[in-house]
Every structure is written in C-alpha cells, then in structure tokens.
C-alpha cells in the first residue's frame, strides 16, 4: 500500500509479474513520475487534495482491496502529502496524515495483519514538519505492536 505522494512506479514495475502480490498506489496524478507504471490499483488524486477528500478516497480504496485476503500489509508511508511539502502536490495537514496512518494501522487490529512500515518521501520546508510527521507515524505504530 503505497501512500507516498509519488506513484510507486518502481514497486509496480518490479512486482508486475507477481500475481500473489497486490500493489496499490494512491498518489498525486500530476506529480512525478510523469510516465506512470501500472499497479494493480492506481488511485490518482488532484492537486491540492485536502484531508477530507483524501481520507474518503483511502477508505474507499481499503474497502476495494479487501485486506483480509492478504498475509501482511507493506505500508509505504511517505509524509510528502503534507501541505508544506516542497515536492508534493497534495494539501494534507499533520492531523490528516495521522488519520491516514491510523486507518492503515487499524488493518492490523481488524484483520490481525502485520503492517510493515517503509519510510517514504518528505521534503517539507521547514524540514521539522517532515521530522514531526515521521515521529507521529512511528509513535502511532508503537501502539499497535504485538
């Protein structure tokens, strides 16, 4: 589950031939890479997408992918959807990102699925916004350890 602001093009390309692995990327449509790879499910978001629309899209996507069919979730947890991010094009607040994280971590609780976190992009100015968002991510994750 790639929630970095940029499409998970490398993951999509590498895993294209692996039918036992489902790839899903929710990303800014007009952002890099400009030539997108084909994930199993790509969700393109408009520039300046805010918390409410992003979270509604994430909820619909999680419903679609039916997580209970999988052994684990690999969570590409970029914080570059932040509104302060210099390379993103979305407009999530720090609270919105925390709500995003919470929805992913709920998969662990709801379906007893391990969630593996991968740090993704984060290019906010000032950089402290990125650091704070990653701190939030791992602090939230600590509440879901088994």
Positions of predicted regions on the chain:
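A general "terminal functional-core" signal
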Residues: 1-146
């Amino acid at each position: 589950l790639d929630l970095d602001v940029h499409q998970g093009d490398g993951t999509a390309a590498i895993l294209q031939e692996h039918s036992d692995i489902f790839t899903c990327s929710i990303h800014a449509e007009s952002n890099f890479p400009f030539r997108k790879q084909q994930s199993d499910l790509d969700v393109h978001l408009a520039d300046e997408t805010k918390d409410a629309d992003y979270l509604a899209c994430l909820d619909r996507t999680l419903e679609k992918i039916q997580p209970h069919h999988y052994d684990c979730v690999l969570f590409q947890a970029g914080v570059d959807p932040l509104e302060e991010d210099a390379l993103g094009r979305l407009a999530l607040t720090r609270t919105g990102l925390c709500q995003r994280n919470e929805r992913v971590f709920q998969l662990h609780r709801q379906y007893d699925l391990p969630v593996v976190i991968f740090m993704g992009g984060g290019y906010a100015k000032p950089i402290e916004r990125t650091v704070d968002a990653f701190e939030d991510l791992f602090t939230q994750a600590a509440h879901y350890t088994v």
